[in-house]
């Protein structure tokens, strides 16, 4: 935009200069032409004066000579303009001519306006508008300094994220796995024979007058499972071994137990099967039914709940 403005200013200045030059040149030309007309008139009058007079030998009619002399007045040798009022040709028109000459002097020279070459207009849609930056506006604007806010920000309270407590898994209810060993038919187990079989399989007579299997064979470790009399009150009469007899015994594993529950169950099942084999009895479940593989799997599922 700035460059276009400068170009238009230069073109306008050149056009004005051209018009002024043309006007001066035209006025001088008209002035010189006026002076040329005056010189022609003077030279014509002088030429008339310098014409040779007719020789005396040639006779002309006197009337014609007299008429010419009377009609024409000899001009003086000076540069004065001829008196046009005495000429019959300019009679009555001298005033108009003088008036016209005066008007021509007063009339200013006509200025012939030359066509200015204008640049083709370009539509606004064709011209990409560029942002105009006014440097004067930028220079005049003084930077404003904002005072720091005196407002003290409110203290931000720390966000307390509640600790997610681990979900407490409820401990399974206590359970007891029971395996019975019963004599064949109505047969009963003899006390001494029974006690010897139990002791050979790692059980030790102890608390509550029953046999216990400890975590170690010495009997100093924790109790893993126990064996009681099937008949109430459930204890054994060891001193009366020869006289004591029972239809069967019960192995029981309390859950949870000391050590690994699945290992303790396998050990109790194996001990019950060995005692039943030695005494000639049958291995029964808690309801005194024959212990089947399906019942064994059920026992294992119950024990698995207590495995760590």
From Swiss-Prot:
The chain crosses the membrane at residues 6-26. Its main location: membrane. This is Cell division protein ZipA. Interacts with FtsZ via their C-terminal domains. It comes from the Bacteria. Residues 1-5 are periplasmic. GO terms for cellular component: cell division site; plasma membrane. Keywords: Cell cycle, Cell division, Cell inner membrane, Cell membrane, Membrane, Transmembrane, Transmembrane helix. Residues 59-82 have a biased composition (Basic and acidic residues). The gene is zipA. Residues 27-308 are cytoplasmic. One of its GO terms (biological process) is FtsZ-dependent cytokinesis. Residues 43-90 are annotated as: Disordered. Gene3D superfamilies: ZipA, C-terminal FtsZ-binding domain (3.30.1400.10). It is found in: Cell inner membrane. It is a single-pass type I membrane protein. The keyword Transmembrane helix applies. Belongs to the ZipA family. Essential cell division protein that stabilizes the FtsZ protofilaments by cross-linking them and that serves as a cytoplasmic membrane anchor for the Z ring. Also required for the recruitment to the septal ring of downstream cell division proteins.
